[in-house]
Design a protein with these regions (language model features):
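Mid-bilayer segments of alpha-helical transmembrane spans in multi-pass integral membrane proteins
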Residues: 87-97, 114, 126-138
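Hydrophobic alpha-helical transmembrane segments in multi-pass integral membrane proteins
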Residues: 266-270, 277-302
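Residues within alpha-helical transmembrane segments of multi-pass membrane proteins, especially transporters
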Residues: 92, 127, 131, 227, ...
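Hydrophobic alpha-helical transmembrane segments of multi-pass membrane transport proteins
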Residues: 76-105, 109-110, 117, 263, ...
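Transmembrane helix boundary and interhelical junction motifs in multipass membrane proteins
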Residues: 57-62, 95-104, 250, 264-279
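Predominantly cytoplasmic-facing regulatory/coupling regions of multi-pass membrane proteins
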Residues: 1-84, 143, 148-264, 289, ...
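Membrane-interface alpha-helices at helix entry/exit sites of multi-pass transporters
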Residues: 77-81, 99-100, 111-126, 289-300
Length: 335
């Protein structure tokens, strides 16, 4: 009942946000013509779809590296299949948790698979993804920091605030990695034996220490994370040109981490409405992109991911021989 109410709330918020955006920018006048322009700019749409596909493949490569760090020897083809399918559950569930749940459950069926290492690999996957996005954003931010004073107050505050957020996140990730080391954990266990002596917690921390044990793999995973976001953000850059707009690449790269973070908030379904408003605000401030064009480009960028999500759904049905009841089971476990 609680999950149903939560979903209804998100659907309601999504509907209201989209209605307000479409009403403000007169959907049939300022937004719809940009969708029609995609017929003439189809190569940009195709390029965007390819970039999304590359980012998904790189996500599978990164996860495979982390799985090896957890001593889970699973074939590259299987990791790629589960990663592609997880995108289907990301767009059909109430959030990323659906895709993450499938990633664990999908590999649990493999011989020798263990639940804790799989769960930790997914958690570390997100952690190193955050690190990669932080490095990319701060690099782009530094590249045009000399222009910050020329921006409007709203955009300036958003960029400054996100810079502090990303900087703080990188520091916290670094502290977390250090806290996973056996020497520091053993010291802490002597100080607080009742809390840190809890065996399941010790097993969890030992699994997380794979970041240090396989430090070469961790560095490779961070570098791949940067590439993942570059290709993901390139798909939105292509979507701008697909709807007939233009925008410098550097500004798009700087804005997209903020857009992704806002869309990831558990407010609306798939970030709809929140993503469009954030994208519109930042693109207009950084590049002068008209509001209607920005909203259309944001929706097209999202639809590119939806298309790959539907491909993941087809792969799920074909390779797993899954029924609707199995899908419902995955969603129930995700909730």
């Amino acid at each position: 009942m609680k999950n149903a109410l939560f979903l209804i709330q998100k659907l309601s918020i999504t509907t209201v946000l989209l209605w307000m955006i479409f009403r403000e920018h007169r959907f049939t006048v300022e937004i719809l013509p940009h969708f029609q322009a995609m017929v003439d700019h189809w190569p940009w749409t195709l390029a965007g779809l390819v970039f999304v596909g590359i980012s998904i493949w790189l996500s599978a490569v990164r996860w495979e590296i982390l799985l090896r760090g957890q001593e889970q020897n699973i074939t590259s083809a299987e990791v790629l299949r589960v990663t592609v399918v997880s995108n289907f559950f990301n767009i059909t569930s109430v959030g990323v948790i659906g895709g993450d749940a499938y990633r664990v459950l999908g590999l649990m069926q493999r011989p020798g698979a263990k639940k804790l290492p799989l769960m930790v690999s997914v958690m570390l996957d997100h952690m190193l993804g955050m690190m990669g996005m932080g490095i990319l954003f701060l690099s782009c931010y530094a590249a045009f920091s000399h222009r910050l004073q020329t921006l409007g107050k709203e955009a300036y505050l958003i960029l400054e605030g996100f810079e502090m957020f990303m900087g703080g996140s990188l520091v916290m990730i670094f502290i977390s990695v250090i806290s996973f080391t056996p020497r520091l954990y053993n010291w802490g266990e002597k100080q607080w034996p009742r809390m840190l002596g809890f065996q399941p917690l010790k097993k969890f921390v030992t699994a997380c220490d794979a970041l240090r044990r396989d430090w070469r793999g961790s560095i490779m995973a961070v570098l791949i994370s940067i590439l993942i976001f570059i290709f993901h953000f390139l798909s939105f850059h292509c979507s701008i040109y697909a709807v007939g707009g233009e925008a410098p690449l550097l500004e798009v790269m700087a804005a997209m981490p903020i857009v992704d973070a806002a869309a990831g908030l558990p407010i609306s379904v798939s970030g709809l409405g929140v993503r469009e408003k954030t994208f519109e605000t930042l693109m207009n401030a950084l590049t002068g992109l008209p509001a209607g064009t920005a909203v259309a480009a944001s929706l097209v960028g999202w639809l590119m991911s939806v298309i790959w999500g539907m491909i993941g759904g087809l792969v799920f049905l074909r390779t797993s021989g899954a029924s609707l009841s199995k899908m419902a089971s995955v969603e129930k476990n995700a909730a």
